[in-house]
Amino acid sequence: MMETKEKVVYPRYAVIRLRGIPTTPRDIATTLHLLRLRRKFTMVVVPGTPSIIGMIQKVNDWVTWGEIDADTLAEVLKKRGRIVGDKPLTLEYLQKWGWQSFEEVALAYITGEIDSLSCRKVRVREGQRPPCIPYLKPFFRLHPPRGGLNSVKLHFSVGGDLGYRGPLINDLIRRML
């Protein structure tokens, strides 16, 4: 008898780079590059797999991270989402690929219905929608936060801005849109 494996749905984390490029050790720079955090104030949304969590913990002194909710992700997609060619992600583009709204895409990603937000072009049959948003850039360029940061040298638990901040990451993201 074959048992069907249930799909494991990992939590989705938003990771924002807060510190710049100079004096970054090579191994940290490589890990940031693999996470697609190549510039200050860029954000990626990643699943919380053990390997990704290990990478985030390695660069913990350069980033802040926490669980993103569907409303914040929909807002980020709407305001800061870009497709290849640096064109804005529009509702018409989503509807072309079978999605009805930004909220629908965000909820599908957070709940694990789709595994990735962005992908290269995929072949789909007529009437089906792809398991991602084709040609979406896998990172989001954000503004510096309104009201500023406390400290990019201290961790969040001691009054700074670096490291794990849990669901409070959503407040920071809204300040950076």
UniProtKB/Swiss-Prot annotation:
Keywords: Ribonucleoprotein, Ribosomal protein. GO terms for biological process: maturation of LSU-rRNA from tricistronic rRNA transcript (SSU-rRNA, 5.8S rRNA, LSU-rRNA); translation. It comes from the Archaea. Signal peptide: none annotated. One of its GO terms (cellular component) is cytosolic large ribosomal subunit. Transmembrane segments: none annotated. Belongs to the universal ribosomal protein uL30 family. PANTHER family: 60S RIBOSOMAL PROTEIN L7, LARGE RIBOSOMAL SUBUNIT PROTEIN UL30. Part of the 50S ribosomal subunit. This is Large ribosomal subunit protein uL30. It comes from Pyrobaculum islandicum (strain DSM 4184 / JCM 9189 / GEO3).
